[in-house]
A protein has these predicted regions:
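Metalloprotease/metallohydrolase-associated module, dominated by Zn2+-dependent proteases
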Residues: 1-63, 80-131
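Active-site recognition of the HExxH zinc-binding catalytic motif
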Residues: 67-80
Length: 131
């Protein structure tokens, strides 16, 4: 089976474990930037997100793929606070907003990294291959 389709099936299996049953997370055919294994963009529309993976993602071992999936799905839960911070752009002064957004982004990534290692163990084994 084509790897994007396998990953989509896997993501769909993981959504209930994350309490994201109302969400549609679509795996994009377009890769993310090469310096990221994956990224997720939560739409302004309710309950919709797009996951992109880099070409390097497919060469990772399956446990690392599972951890990365967990990391990205955690970001779906963080999208509300992230939008709150983004809404302050133009309200706060440039320096204050820059400081807030930089610190917030760094701390969200730290939280996702720490939690993804633990949460990944709750996910089913991943068996997603390169196309």
């Amino acid at each position: 089976m084509y790897s994007i389709q396998e990953l989509q099936t896997y993501i769909n299996r993981c959504l209930p474990i994350f309490g994201l049953t109302q969400w549609k997370v679509e795996v994009s055919k377009h890769p993310t930037e090469e310096d990221n294994w994956a990224d997720i963009e939560v739409s302004d529309n309710l309950w919709s997100a797009t996951l992109r993976v880099s070409s390097d993602f497919w060469g990772l071992d399956n446990d690392e793929k599972r951890r990365i999936v967990a990391h990205e799905l955690l970001h779906v839960h963080y999208s509300g606070p992230e939008r709150t911070v983004e809404s302050l752009n133009g309200v706060l002064g440039t320096e204050a907003y820059s400081l807030l957004s930089t610190v917030f982004e760094k701390e969200i990534e730290r939280a996702a990294d720490a939690l993804s290692t633990v949460v990944a163990r709750l996910l089913p084994p991943v068996d997603v291959h390169s196309s």
